Amino acid sequence: MARVKRAVNAHKKRRVVLERASGYRGQRSRLYRKAKEQLLHSFNYNFRDRKARKGDFRKLWIQRINAAVRAEGITYNRFIQGLRLAGIELDRRALAEIAVSDPNTFKTIVDAAKAALPEDVNAPVEA
């Protein structure tokens, strides 16, 4: 049976793993087995957190919008309801950006949402 010489492939495989783990602390950046294990965990964290990032940004946009509309004397919930009734279709990302970068435009949007709201808070809403 012929001899299989795999030293080059094995060294390359180990070198790639250790290069990818170069920023890790302690043995995780120096020992192949520890580095490989940490890389597998890192890939899982990366996948999970790419999904979580979307929710984190949505929470951030809602907080920014809430702070801006409370300065105008309305709650976030009533503001979103007013936007829907006024037929204004801006997503939370755009609203948060407008609230931060252009307060005058945001104030006009808030005024339009306020105008679309019914006077009585408990009145049935027809959308």
Swiss-Prot record:
<dbReference type="InterPro" id="IPR035566">
    <property type="entry name" value="Ribosomal_protein_bL20_C"/>
</dbReference>
<dbReference type="InterPro" id="IPR005813">
    <property type="entry name" value="Ribosomal_bL20"/>
</dbReference>
<protein>
    <recommendedName>
        <fullName>Large ribosomal subunit protein bL20</fullName>
    </recommendedName>
</protein>
<dbReference type="InterPro" id="IPR049946">
    <property type="entry name" value="RIBOSOMAL_L20_CS"/>
</dbReference>
<dbReference type="GO" id="GO:1990904">
    <property type="term" value="C:ribonucleoprotein complex"/>
</dbReference>
<dbReference type="GO" id="GO:0019843">
    <property type="term" value="F:rRNA binding"/>
</dbReference>
<comment type="function">
    <text>Binds directly to 23S ribosomal RNA and is necessary for the in vitro assembly process of the 50S ribosomal subunit. It is not involved in the protein synthesizing functions of that subunit.</text>
</comment>
<dbReference type="GO" id="GO:0000027">
    <property type="term" value="P:ribosomal large subunit assembly"/>
</dbReference>
<keyword id="KW-0694">RNA-binding</keyword>
<dbReference type="GO" id="GO:0005840">
    <property type="term" value="C:ribosome"/>
</dbReference>
<dbReference type="GO" id="GO:0003735">
    <property type="term" value="F:structural constituent of ribosome"/>
</dbReference>
<dbReference type="Pfam" id="PF00453">
    <property type="entry name" value="Ribosomal_L20"/>
</dbReference>
<keyword id="KW-0689">Ribosomal protein</keyword>
<comment type="similarity">
    <text>Belongs to the bacterial ribosomal protein bL20 family.</text>
</comment>
<dbReference type="GO" id="GO:0006412">
    <property type="term" value="P:translation"/>
</dbReference>
<keyword id="KW-0699">rRNA-binding</keyword>
<keyword id="KW-0687">Ribonucleoprotein</keyword>
